[in-house]
Amino acid sequence: MTKNRTEVADIDRSLYDFTYGEEGFERLDAGITPDIVREISAKKDEPQWMLDLRLKSLEIFNRFPDPTWGPSIEGLDMDNIVTYVKPNTDQKHDWESVPDDIKNTFERLGIPDAERSYLAGVGAQYDSELVYHNMQDTASKMGIVYSGIEEALHDPQWEPLIHEKFMTLIPPTDHKFAALHGAVWSGGSFVYVPKGTKLDFPLQSYFRLNAKGAGQFEHTLIIVEDDADLHFIEGCSAPKYNVANLHAGAVELFVGKRAHLRYSTIENWSKNMYNLNTKRARVDEDGDIEWISGSFGSHVGYLYPMSVLNGRRARSSFTGITFAGAGQNLDTGCKVVLNAPETSATVETKGISKSGGIQTFRSSIVATPKAEGSKATVSCQSLMLDDQSRSDTIPAMDISAKNVDIGHEATIGRIGDDKVFYLMSRGISEEEARTMIVNGFANPVSKELPLEYAVEMNNLIKLEMEGAIG
């Protein structure tokens, strides 16, 4: 039975809600079939093993049921989703060579300025393909590899490593949309940081889904070898449409012994988006993974970055904020598997809901029998801005080890009238006062972001708060 397309109320996000059309773009047919999967693979001239993985993933996708634990995705009909849209250009390494319509999009989003100001490298994806990729000479001279993952897949030096790692942390059997990703993935980044290499400036990838009724399925694969250090930033946005769009990307992070990786994300999808993203890290002995996450936008969201701590004294920290407004049901959280002695994890999240938005936080801490002497703490704070909104906290703990210390605390509250009245007594309007309080609530996340992204997050909160009074 054919489902109706999702209708979503218009929301003013003028910085992101613009499009220059699709002149010269190539769209495959909507839906997902073996022929479509083969066509995607053929366009990319992939090795046979990748085509085999795609077709096997499609079989798994067709067998698996929709998830039952989170928000309804009944309005998402894959028969209406276009899984591949090629923009009107191949990948460029010179910004001036990018077509004007795409270049104007990223310039409005501030990507070139960010690259000039503080980034060691940047990749920009438009719909299904990377359109721009560049890395500073200082990073390349250090032996760091930062390229499109498809470019690396066709490089004899890196194809064996990609074959070894690709979709091993997130196998197609993990869940239905991991299988979908395995079948139709396109675009994304490959990063390799050699042993002992420490990059002082971040790398960034920005993903823009421009096409109406389409999906974006980029794959990010990052390998940080022993004693190396990297900060990677991911940004996402899309214009709004009155039909469903889908994002089902995947992120696989391999962190070596005594290595450190910070992965920062600001997701600002349009509110017709189904964001069903999967992110996972494996951390070896004395390694450290930091997740910094800001989730704004999307109609329905499932997002639970996961850390598997496989080496003694491996560490994971997660700091995240989710803002659910009108018409949004965002189910977010974090998972940690303590799978070696003396591992440790901290999870700190902030959730904000307004105008009937629903925000759910899920945490899962698993201590395997190998995790003796490990520790984990989970803290969740939620702020509801009106009587129509909802916030839930759903913790899960599975402890099979001795001598572990695992704790969880959660608080749900509202903005105190006394705080608002105090600020108003200083000449601040009620709306500005509430915005200031919400920004203060979000500060533990924003202070961990690069300045430009912290400003963007505060502006997003301000935009969401406009008209919140009355």
Regions found by a protein language model. Give the residues of each.
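Short, low-to-moderate order helix/coil transition modules at the start of elongated helical scaffolds
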Residues: T2-A250, F254, H260
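Short arginine-rich
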Residues: N62-P71, F441-L451
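Conserved beta-strand/loop scaffold segments within soluble protein domains that form the structured core
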Residues: N134, K141, V145-F421, S425-I428, ...
